[in-house]
Amino acid sequence: MNELTYDELKFPNYVNSNTAIRLRAKVGEPELDREGKDARPLKTLELTLSDVVYAAELAGLNMLFVSDTGRGKTQLMSDVAWHHYGGDQETGQANWADGRPSFDITDLFERTRVDLDSGKFDSDTARQVKEERVKRLFFGVDEINRAPGPKQNEFFDLADGKYTFNGKRLNLGEDGYALFMATANLNKLNGDFSGTFELDRALLNRAHLTFDLDHPNFRPTPEDEMVIEERKANPKVDLAPAQDLTGKILTINKKILTAAKQLDPYFTAFRFLVGRGLDYCDTDKYKEKGAAFPMLCNECGYTGKDLCSMIKGSSERSIPAVKTLAYALSYLAELKLGEKVEIDPLDAVLQAFRFTTYHGNLNELVAQEEYAARNQTMMDETVEKLSGVVNTLRDYLPMMIAGQDPTIISYQFQGNRVKAPKDQKTVQALNKANISFQETNLKKELKEKGLGVDWVDPYVKRMKELK
């Protein structure tokens, strides 16, 4: 089997060349300078929304596409189902359902066989599971919010890659890979979609990534819209030519998951920052946001558009998705460019964070009042503020990874401002030379931004043990 190519992934019908994310990266083989350091310059990589979807597919991450009508979300999901998984016909690897009240999941996964010879009918023994359907790798639900609450509950297990038959939990897909994808009309301050229902929070949490196709950066460009207009005369969804890439997708998925399981000091620091750091609340009696978020924000000095009042700590469900998507973006970038790519690790996790920490984490009061329910816009501003904190963390990370206390001293020397890790030898030398210096400490800087720091010392201790 040949390796997967970027051209094979390209959607045949869905068109969107808009830049969704930008990542700093070093491209090509390493070029060492005289000191043995990598001399490759940092370049900015631009990836489209389609690229992010490809990466999420390779990572095996569930996706939810939300927008007003006519943004192409059903066309996008249809292209994935038919062009990557061979469609839902007999030989395909995709399951497809419409989120309507009459939908019955048993129709998809079960059949009834009657023993005509015996003349008896036993409903339990007559029910059989459709093994070929259970083993399919893709499950798509169009307009999932047209299904009422009880029907939405049927999708919980599917999003977890499970199906229950006769009391037994069956694994969907193959080798642990089962991709769930859905479309919905959400994020409307004053909804005008009749026959729709609010999505259950538990179901939203099972969507590892959420894409708001109404967002300016995620919708097709005017040039794309002209291409679409010239290409088709009717507004119906086009079925892509059936193509089955499942074998190649599974191979890459294993590589990505293997890489994501490795301890990465950069990601570990980031996960603590967006987990324990963002979950800290100075106003709360127990010093954590929890159920108090966002109500206590109204009485806090950080209230407004400060980072800690905009978002709470990430859940244990979303944190692994951030790491896996970050690795998948690196793999997709190499696939697209056809050469080695080393993406800045903190850039990668920041961009992954934009899509994976969406529902239930943002301050809903601020989202409604200040952003008119434009959650992705609020998320982008949150990530912009978080990137400032990450850049602060970036200065301290080398010494933390080396197992050193995250304290930096800065001083003037020969007309230049010098920054260096604080150690006894450097301090003695500066005092002897009568050179004044200033100290900055990571924990102090994070506290000033209203973020938790109880993770810093354990992180440094663990890095020191791993040296």
Please give the residue ranges for each predicted region.
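Conserved alpha-helical scaffold flanking the Walker A/P-loop in AAA+ ATPase domains
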Residues: 52-55, 112-139
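Hydrophobic anchor at the beta1->P-loop junction of P-loop NTPases
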Residues: 65, 140-141
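Walker B catalytic acidic pair
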Residues: 142-144, 154
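C-terminal engagement/docking regions of AAA+ P-loop ATPases
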Residues: 70-75, 297-467
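Conserved AAA+ ATPase small/helical "lid" subdomain
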Residues: 44-45, 232-330, 334-337
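Walker A/P-loop
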Residues: 54, 58-101
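Canonical AAA+ ATPase core
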Residues: 146-151, 161-256
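Pre-Walker A (pre-P-loop) alpha-helix and adjacent loop at the N terminus of AAA/AAA+ ATPase modules
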Residues: 2-69
